[in-house]
């Protein structure tokens, strides 16, 4: 299914409906080092290189996505400015201390958030930041049906499930409340510096019942977390 996500939601955008004024949350780029968790087609990596990043690493579990990203970033890879890893985010990488780890709708797929957060924490310099976006937890339990917003599950009921609407391919997901994400980040040692729930700027439906603009205009679609590794 990697082709479904080719060039979707990459820097400076953080979610499916666009982010607007929140595009600059990545902070200074020139001369900095970055790691993208779940690099997809590699467009965010290319964006950072073009903006003067010293080095950009990327990790993704998909060989197809790695091929996409490697082709797009062929020149900076040969110059040693980009290095890609085909591994699960739960596996520890050997990396120099880096300035910023980020993930655009990638980190939320982890099957072991404690292990993944421990990895991310270890990669960062003291004072480094982890910035990531994911579906807002409230958005996840509401769908649109016949023009009305319908609560399709309990916000309080955290659950694992297999989604079967991805062209017939079963996909594992786990729904977590915002409070749970906060505790996971805190317990990993991070300080949550900011939390954003931006309004949409792209005014069109992306799916028939889930990513609809009427829903996104009333309920925040994306959540963006800015987390700091204390000095």
Enumerate the language-model features and the residues they cover:
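Conserved alpha-helix/loop element of class I SAM-dependent methyltransferases that forms part
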Residues: 2-30
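Class I SAM-dependent methyltransferase SAM/SAH-binding core
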Residues: 35, 41-91
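A short acidic, Gly/Pro-enriched loop at the edge of an enzyme's catalytic core
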Residues: 93-101
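A short SAM/SAH-binding and catalytic strip from SAM-dependent methyltransferases
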Residues: 100-113
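A short glycine-rich, Lys/Arg-flanked "PGG" loop and its adjoining helix->strand segment in the class I
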Residues: 114-126
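Conserved class I S-adenosyl-L-methionine
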Residues: 131-160
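Short alpha-helix
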Residues: 172-195
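C-terminal lobe and adjacent flexible extensions of AdoMet/dcAdoMet transferase-like proteins
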Residues: 188-231
């Amino acid at each position: 299914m990697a082709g479904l996500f080719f060039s979707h939601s990459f820097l400076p955008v953080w979610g499916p409906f666009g982010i607007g004024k929140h595009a600059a949350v990545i902070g200074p780029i020139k001369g900095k080092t970055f790691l993208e968790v779940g690099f997809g087609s590699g467009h965010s990596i290319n964006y950072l290189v073009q903006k003067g990043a010293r080095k950009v690493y990327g990790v993704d579990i998909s060989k197809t996505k790695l091929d996409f990203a490697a082709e797009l970033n062929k020149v900076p890879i040969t110059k040693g400015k980009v290095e890609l890893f085909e591994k699960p985010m739960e596996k520890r990488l050997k990396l120099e201390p880096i300035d910023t780890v980020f993930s655009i709708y990638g980190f939320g797929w982890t099957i072991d958030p404690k292990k993944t957060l421990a990895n991310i924490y270890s990669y960062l310099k003291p004072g480094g930041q982890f910035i990531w976006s994911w579906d807002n937890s409230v958005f996840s339990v509401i769908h649109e049906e016949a023009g009305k917003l319908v609560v399709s599950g309990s916000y309080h009921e955290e659950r694992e499930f297999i989604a079967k609407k991805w062209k017939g391919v079963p996909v594992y997901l786990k729904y977590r409340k915002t409070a749970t994400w906060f505790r996971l980040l805190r317990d990993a040692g991070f300080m949550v510096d900011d939390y954003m729930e931006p309004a949409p700027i792209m005014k069109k439906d992306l799916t028939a019942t889930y990513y609809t603009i009427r829903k996104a205009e009333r309920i925040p679609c994306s959540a963006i977390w800015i987390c700091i590794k204390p000095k």
